[in-house]
Swiss-Prot record:
<comment type="function">
    <text>One of the primary rRNA binding proteins. Required for association of the 30S and 50S subunits to form the 70S ribosome, for tRNA binding and peptide bond formation. It has been suggested to have peptidyltransferase activity; this is somewhat controversial. Makes several contacts with the 16S rRNA in the 70S ribosome.</text>
</comment>
<protein>
    <recommendedName>
        <fullName>Large ribosomal subunit protein uL2</fullName>
    </recommendedName>
</protein>
<dbReference type="InterPro" id="IPR008991">
    <property type="entry name" value="Translation_prot_SH3-like_sf"/>
</dbReference>
<dbReference type="GO" id="GO:0003735">
    <property type="term" value="F:structural constituent of ribosome"/>
</dbReference>
<dbReference type="InterPro" id="IPR022666">
    <property type="entry name" value="Ribosomal_uL2_RNA-bd_dom"/>
</dbReference>
<dbReference type="GO" id="GO:0002181">
    <property type="term" value="P:cytoplasmic translation"/>
</dbReference>
<keyword id="KW-0699">rRNA-binding</keyword>
<dbReference type="InterPro" id="IPR002171">
    <property type="entry name" value="Ribosomal_uL2"/>
</dbReference>
<dbReference type="Pfam" id="PF03947">
    <property type="entry name" value="Ribosomal_L2_C"/>
</dbReference>
<dbReference type="GO" id="GO:0003723">
    <property type="term" value="F:RNA binding"/>
</dbReference>
<dbReference type="GO" id="GO:0019843">
    <property type="term" value="F:rRNA binding"/>
</dbReference>
<dbReference type="Pfam" id="PF00181">
    <property type="entry name" value="Ribosomal_L2"/>
</dbReference>
<dbReference type="GO" id="GO:0016740">
    <property type="term" value="F:transferase activity"/>
</dbReference>
<comment type="subunit">
    <text>Part of the 50S ribosomal subunit. Forms a bridge to the 30S subunit in the 70S ribosome.</text>
</comment>
<dbReference type="InterPro" id="IPR022669">
    <property type="entry name" value="Ribosomal_uL2_C"/>
</dbReference>
<comment type="similarity">
    <text>Belongs to the universal ribosomal protein uL2 family.</text>
</comment>
<dbReference type="InterPro" id="IPR005880">
    <property type="entry name" value="Ribosomal_uL2_bac/org-type"/>
</dbReference>
């Protein structure tokens, strides 16, 4: 998918880019795979903001995407490649030979008419899903499970991929997009290939309004707030932070403080951290 560059006919158009959507084959989603999506605007069940900078935006339907890929040995044909407003990757509508329809994340190179299949005996071909233990070393994969049968949780964003490095007993070594090397059970499934729509990260929104269409509200600096709104607020003019270190709006240290639980059980499965050289 290419990048479309606009002429600077207005201030909002200057530097604006967008995807050309050349891979998209239809603009009409499969109705049976849509569910209503209520806008939460970052609020929890008490009506309190739990995630800042969310609200507004275009109304969306949620597409039911199959992350489990557990329909073994039943072939499916790719019918369409579609835009999904709820994620950075595109999705593909597949029709199984037994009549079932499903959405999957569209990997790079997947085309309409292509046949895909899931299961331990599946070929190492883009779009096929199989257990990690059955995937050869060096293969690029995405949509990786962390627990067998729970569905893919890792490597689902546009352009993302992980690589199989080897095996160690019942575990398989996988290098993630961040550089972290992690052991994952060999019975966990993954899909072969790189997630498509890899140009997504190169898009320049160009104006504030496009962020609002996406449901993203402005991010205001703490230093321009009042003291009752943020620890950095108050003072005359451009005042410094006034504390030992920068703080979050709730008074906790920001910038550099490690937030990972030191007793996390999954530590033993991480062979190399993402920030290790």
């Amino acid at each position: 998918m290419g990048i479309r560059v606009y002429k600077p006919t207005t201030n909002g158009r200057r530097n604006m880019t967008s995807l050309d959507f050349a891979e998209i084959t239809t603009s009409t989603p499969e109705k049976s795979l849509l569910v209503a999506l209520k806008s939460k605007a970052g609020r929890n069940n008490n009506g309190r903001i739990t995630v800042r900078h969310q609200g507004g935006g275009h109304k969306r339907f949620y597409r039911l995407v199959d992350f489990k890929r557990n329909k073994d040995n039943v072939e499916a044909v790719v019918k369409t490649i579609e835009y999904d407003p709820n994620r950075s990757a595109n999705i593909a509508l597949v029709h199984y030979t037994d009549g079932v329809k499903a959405y999957i994340i569209a990997p790079k190179g997947l085309e309409v008419g292509q046949r895909i299949v899931s299961g331990p005996e599946a070929d190492i071909k883009v779009g096929n899903a199989l257990p990690l233990a059955n995937i050869p070393v060096g293969t690029l994969i995405h949509n990786i499970e962390l627990k067998p049968g729970r569905g893919g949780e890792l490597v689902r964003a546009a352009g993302a991929s992980a690589q199989v490095l080897g095996s160690e007993g019942k575990y398989v070594l996988v290098r993630l997009q961040s550089g972290e090397v992690r052991m994952i059970l060999g019975t966990c499934r993954a899909t072969v290939g790189v997630v498509g729509n890899e140009q997504h990260g190169l898009v320049n929104l160009g104006k504030a309004g496009r962020s609002r269409w996406k449901g993203i509200r402005p991010t205001v600096r703490g230093s321009v707030m009042n003291p009752n709104d943020h620890p950095h607020g108050g003072g005359e003019g451009k005042a410094p932070v006034g504390r030992k270190a920068p703080s979050t709006p709730w008074g906790k240290p920001a910038l550099g403080l490690k937030t990972r639980n030191k007793k996390a059980k999954s530590d033993k499965l991480i062979v190399r951290r993402r920030n290790e050289k």
